Amino acid sequence: FYKNQYLYALTYNQGNAGTTRSYIMDSNNEVKARSGEFAVKRFTTYGIYDKYIMTSSTGDGPTAYADENGYLPKMFLLSYLDVSAETFTTNDTQNKAYMSENFLGNGEYVTLAGILERNNKLYSAAIPMGLSQYGSATDGGKWILPGNEDLVKTEDGGSNSSSYKKGELQWTQYPNKCWVAIFDDETLTNKKIIETDKISYACGRFKSQYYQTIWAADNGDIYVFSPSYAKTMADKRQQTTLDAGVVRIKAGTEEFDPDYYYSIEAQTGGKSFIRCWHITGDYFLLLMYDRPLTETGFTANQLAIYKGETGKLTYVTGLPSADLISGFGNTPYVENGYAYMAVTTTEGYPSIYKIDPVGAVATKGVSIEATQISGVGKLQPQN
């Protein structure tokens, strides 16, 4: 949803471009498709900046930038949907400003997670992805940390979002750091990068999607959440030792607050989360896993409220039993300080729950005769 005006069906088509179109509510309160259809590039994250719905992923750059081995550098691949003009544009990867290689100064390429507009700037978590073929081969392998030589792939393999090529060092060598990129505007061509060693990289992960976990409170403070997903890495050298936790960028600054850090796991018996959203004030809604990421079979079937100023996490009461919940909506709808979340269970029809963040209490609302509800939002009639 773009505000209360437009509903966009962002289609993700197994890594390829998918057809995207938008909808409005007319003066007769009927939802109507708009005329434009767009083939949006594959994307791993998305968000709203100014008049645009933006999508981003990282992929191969142009052949003009290939190295002596023919390896292509990784570049940011951006799409811009101008919601009012109903136009679609993409970035020019001939511009080296979109180079994702060595983005953090450690040789690794990154992908972006989340698009947050604050004070006309664009904040995004920069997620280190390891060394591409291009990065691994640079200057005879200077970016490969001593003792990590055996992490470089000796053949092609993997599948889907975990596929890799011979010569890559897949996944980051720096799991105990978090970076945030602060861009001047939606072009992403001018940036400042800040880092902290209090948390691991800031995003939730599911297949090829990198979920936004960087959000602003109403007072302008920006909270950066890390689920510590690197705990799931197979090799100990690439596993984070840091708890899922939260750091902050105070309003009016572009640095991490040195006096702010809270552990999520210390309040949950070691359990983490996959997604989070801002509700109101400094209250945030977290979609929690049922067990630590160091165990197998974890699933996200609980909700919790995090209060930024105190760092306190409180599980939401009033929801169906966690063992009956089979899914939640992709994103909540927020209005007048409450969050409205779709909840699907194995018994009965899915329902919308109203969540009071102050009391961390959910109240059941309308049920829908359907198998599941992927989301909930609100459209105002447009002339």
Question: What is the predicted role of each segment?
Answer:
Residues 1-106:
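Post-signal peptide N-terminal segment of secreted/secretory-pathway proteins
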Residues 1-2, 37-51, 100-115, 201-214, ...:
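Repeated scaffold domains used in trafficking and secretory/extracellular systems
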Residues 20-26, 70-87, 138-189, 237-254, ...:
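Beta-propeller blade signature
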Residues 29-40, 83-105, 155-156, 190-199, ...:
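Beta-propeller fold detector
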Residues 99-207, 215:
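Aromatic- and glycine-enriched pocket-lining scaffold segments that form the walls
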Residues 174-181, 186-256, 262-263, 269-272:
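Beta-propeller domains
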Residues 257-348:
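Intrinsically disordered, low-complexity segments enriched in Gly and acidic/Ser/Thr residues
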